[in-house]
Amino acid sequence: MALHEPPSKLNRHSHSNLLKPPSLNKPILTFADNDCLKTPTMNDMLKTPTVNSPRHTPMNIDGTPKVNGFSGFTPQTDQKFFGEHEPLFNQMHTTTLMPAPSSSYKEPAYSSEQPSSSSDEAKPKELLGSNSFGVPRMTNGNSKQKPEELTLKDIEISSTGPGGVDSPGLSAAMFQFSPMVEHFLQNLTNKAGLPELVVDSKTAGLNHQEPSDLIKSVQVRRSSIEDQKFSDVLHVPTLPRKTSEPSHLGSSLQNEHPQSNSRPSTVIPRVQRTNTSASLTRSMDHSSMSPISAHDDPYSNSASYSSLSTHTSFSDSASLAHFEPKTEPMDDYSYNFSDNDFNSFEFSSTSEELKNIGCQKMKSSKMPLQDRPYKCPRDGCDRRFSRSDELTRHIRIHTGQKPFQCRICMRAFSRSDHLTTHVRTHTGEKPFSCDICGRKFARSDERKRHTKVHKTSRSGS
């Protein structure tokens, strides 16, 4: 619109000429036809940019420079409204859908030319009214309109965006915001579908499994490893646990059965029980094949690997319960032994179990009964011990309990020192070394037996 030069001073008649038709030019109190006392109707709101603008009419002071089109509370001679000019209607329509960001900057040229406080109060209310109802403001031509291509682009973007995400039937294009807010909303509208695309492309590109599939695969892999460990334990045959009374134990030679589980509560000593009427000669024949040392073996003390048949007395030489030594220590500790070591190991001494069985009276004579106050509570077992921990280890032989389990191969042991020695077979630790030749061993009894080899070689030479 054309900018009209503000008159230098408005008199009473010229001011009323701008506001009312010529027929109503009379006193100054009737120049607005009492519009300030009327409640604005819908037609008034549609015809005027702001709803509350007629109230400011009597507060204007004569002599205040007024700009045509700025305080348009009444129709001006060069002002157009809805339907009167088609291009203006189209511009209003596009601006209502996506208002121009320059709406917040209004009348920069004449902001300093209005010293009146009433005119200053009219400006924010006009802004409020136009922002609330989306009615186009009549500018004086100084404020720049938003380019048409940008407006069309914004409308197109908002139409392609996910309409109805925040509120069904409403869109951000129906409201007017500041340029910064419009820029932020445009970024959100353009990137609305980006998260799903990023997740889908990442999943497709990296070929990741779902979290549930990963958990299932880990569980399957773990179960397969445990099955493999348990299957390795199955290679060592064991005896089924016997929970019957002692009179039902060991009447004939028991066959070894593989145990399906090697946990401490189910695994029993891997020994064979022979006939209880076996002779002492047969027992000593088996003792010559024993791979366990007599005194220095940590596996063989007064409580280890004793008889499981507790219905007979150890002092009775007529009925002896014999243990066939397990081959497991040979498998665990013999990988660095030579043939000479094996020969000397097999035939140099008898096991502690057989010595306790065959020489019970001699051992009892060595240690008085008062020095062995702990007696085995099992019926038929006359074993006595000087310490309570020895009795505890001895009772595990009757019950078959093995509370110490190897975490590598899941093998169980009845004593902690047995487990410690067994773990060295996995780690390769050899803390014991020969003082003569420097050879290292994992067990102290192995080193002692090796030292005897040096002594015999010196005595023979």
From Swiss-Prot:
This protein's encoding gene: egrh-1
Span of zinc fingers (C2H2-type): 374-398, 404-426, 432-454
Outcome of gene disruption: RNAi-mediated knockdown causes abnormalities in oocyte development, including degrading oocytes in the proximal gonadal arm and ectopic developing oocytes in the distal arm. RNAi-mediated knockdown targeted to the soma, on an rrf-1 mutant background, exhibits only a slight increase in the frequency of oocyte defects.
Main localization (coarse): nucleus
Biased composition (Polar residues): 96-105, 129-144, 249-265, 272-291
Keyword annotations of the record: Cytoplasm, DNA-binding, Metal-binding, Nucleus, Repeat, Transcription, Transcription regulation, Zinc, Zinc-finger
SUPFAM superfamilies documented for this protein: beta-beta-alpha zinc fingers
Pfam families noted in UniProt: zf-C2H2
Flavoprotein recorded as keyword: no
UniProt name for this protein: Early growth response factor homolog 1
Region (Disordered): 1-25, 96-152, 232-308
The protein's role, per its UniProt record: Sequence-specific DNA-binding transcription factor. Plays a role in oocyte development, acting cell-autonomously in the somatic gonad. Involved in negative regulation of oocyte MAPK activation and inhibits oocyte maturation and ovulation.
Organism: Caenorhabditis elegans
Bias kind Low complexity: ranges: 299-308
InterPro entries referenced in this protein's UniProt entry, alphabetically: Znf_C2H2_sf, Znf_C2H2_type
Record-level GO BP terms: negative regulation of oocyte maturation; negative regulation of ovulation; regulation of transcription by RNA polymerase II
Tissue: Expressed in sheath cells and distal tip cells of the somatic gonad, as well as in the intestine and sperm (at protein level). Expression not observed in oocytes (at protein level).
Family listed: Belongs to the EGR C2H2-type zinc-finger protein family.
GO terms, molecular function: DNA-binding transcription factor activity, RNA polymerase II-specific; RNA polymerase II cis-regulatory region sequence-specific DNA binding; zinc ion binding
Superkingdom in the source lineage: Eukaryota
Subcellular location: Nucleus; Cytoplasm, Perinuclear region
Any single Gene Ontology cellular-component annotation: nucleus
